[in-house]
Structure formats: C-alpha cells, structure tokens
From Swiss-Prot:
One of its GO terms (cellular component) is cytosol. Its EC number is 3.1.-.-. CDD domains: TatD_DNAse. It comes from Bacillus subtilis (strain 168). This is Uncharacterized metal-dependent hydrolase YabD. Its cofactor is a divalent metal cation. A divalent metal cation 2 binds at residues 92, 128, 153. InterPro entries: DNase_TatD-rel_CS, Metal_Hydrolase, TatD-like, TatD/YcfH-like. Belongs to the metallo-dependent hydrolases superfamily. TatD-type hydrolase family. A divalent metal cation 1 binds at residues 6, 8, 92, 203.
Length: 255
C-alpha cells in the first residue's frame, strides 16, 4: 500500500535492529522500499539486501559530496551491477554545494558521467540537489536526461522548478520536510503538481517527519508524509498511498 522510494537501510544506524525496523514498516503496510547506495560500501550492502528481502529494490550511484573519490572503475562497476533485475535506478547523483569536500567541477563531471551511464543501461535516475538548483537543471537539460527521467529526491524547490523538472520526465518525491511547520514552499508545490508526478520517501535515517523530528527516521514513518500530502491535496490517505505506489511502480517498472 505504501512505497518508500528512498531509504538508506544500508546505513550503520540500522546495524543493531534492522529486522525490527522492517517489521514496523510491514506493520504500517509499507510494501516496497528502494534502498539507495551512494558509494562502494553502501552499494555493496544494497546489493546484498535485494537478495535477502523480496520487497527491497536498489538504486546505485555516487553521491556528489564524495564525487572526488569516484574512479572510472567505480563507474564500470555500477554499470555491471545495474544489470540485476532488482536494480531499478541509477543514483543518487547530482550536485551538493552545501559541503565543499568535492570541487564543483568534479561534481559536475561525475554527475554527467552517471547520466550518460543511466541512458546507456536505460534506467531512471535519482537526483540529489542541495543549493545547486540552477546547475542541476542545466545539466539535466544538456545531457538529455529526459530520455530516462527519474526522481527529484526530497524535493523542496519552487513550483517553477517543479514544472521544469516535470517537463523533463521527472517525478517529485517528498519526504519528512513537507511535514515541518515552516515548509511553506514544498506544501504549495504539493498542492499544485499533478497526482501522476507525485512520490513519497523517507530518506531514512535522515529528515525524520513530524512528530518524530530529531529522532532516527525509518520506512514506517513514510505514512506521516502520505498523511500530510493527503491533507494538502484534500484527498484520503488511501488515495495518496495508492497513487504514489502506482507512480513508483510505473517509474521503476515493477509489476
């Protein structure tokens, strides 16, 4: 009934109680989860998890903060792994100008290389954008990303940016921040965008929704995101759960 399109259950924060976290997700009717890998260790763990759990799928890519560490061998490795039937997207990828570990020019190169790879293997992409909207949108356009489409992960941008992304065949995914009291912009965007472009996520263990803000996030909390969106859209929780699940299945080509 619920589909968490972006989770990091491969993070060390779940090393001691992963089974309990998964049981709570099932109890809240979270039927599918995409676990996102963004470097060698997290990709390796995501690939293990898709073998261990039938309802978990993987997205594999390289996070922009760590772009400086990515090698040609890493890109080739991701390409090889992407042939697995339960790898449903390339990413997360993108640009992050909040942290300065990786220079902007290297981030851009790694971003472009991953878009090219996704087009080659015909998989959608998952976009991480922090303080870099203009450059992200420009690169998506220049690299012809609309050929594969994908997700603007944890979208907090303006309605204008949302429209530009949707024109390029992207879905907008909302997480915990849409439940925050001061989140005026994402709430307005949720009201405006068509239902067939809407996804939900947790980005756990980060960005925990109200009323658990400040604690470790987990997939069961995606219901609070769905509840908030239902309220904003003046729809029922069940309608939003169904719409966002069908959208995710369509994007990821899951029957």
């Amino acid at each position: 009934m619920l589909f968490d399109t972006h989770a990091h259950l491969n993070a060390e924060q779940y090393d001691t109680d992963l089974e309990e976290v998964i049981e709570r997700a099932k109890a809240e009717k979270v039927e599918r989860i995409v676990v996102v890998g963004f470097d060698r260790p997290t990709i390796t763990r995501a690939m293990e998890m898709i073998e261990e759990y039938d309802f978990i799928y993987a997205a594999i890519g390289w996070h922009p903060v760590d772009a400086i560490d990515m090698t040609e061998e890493d890109l080739a490795w991701i390409k090889e792994l992407s042939a697995h039937e339960k790898v449903v997207a390339i990413g997360e990828m993108g640009l992050d100008y909040h942290w300065d570990k990786s220079p902007k020019d290297i981030q851009k190169e790694v971003f472009r290389n991953q878009i090219a790879l996704a087009k080659e293997v015909n998989l959608p992409i998952i976009i991480h954008n922090r303080d870099a909207t203009e450059d992200v949108v420009t690169i998506l356009k220049e690299e012809g990303a609309e050929a594969v489409g994908g997700i603007m992960h944890c979208f907090t941008g303006s309605a204008e940016v949302a429209r530009e992304c949707m024109k390029m065949n992207f879905y907008l995914s909302f997480g915990g921040p849409v439940t925050f009291k001061n989140a005026k912009k994402p709430k307005e965007v949720v009201k405006e965008i068509p239902n067939d472009r809407l996804l939900i996520e947790t980005d756990c263990p980060f960005l925990t929704p109200h009323p658990f803000r400040g604690k470790r996030n987990e997939p069961s909390y995606v219901k609070y995101v769905a509840e908030q969106i239902a309220e904003l859209k003046e729809m029922t929780f069940e309608e939003i759960a169904s719409i966002t699940t069908e959208n995710a299945k369509r994007l990821f080509r899951i029957n």
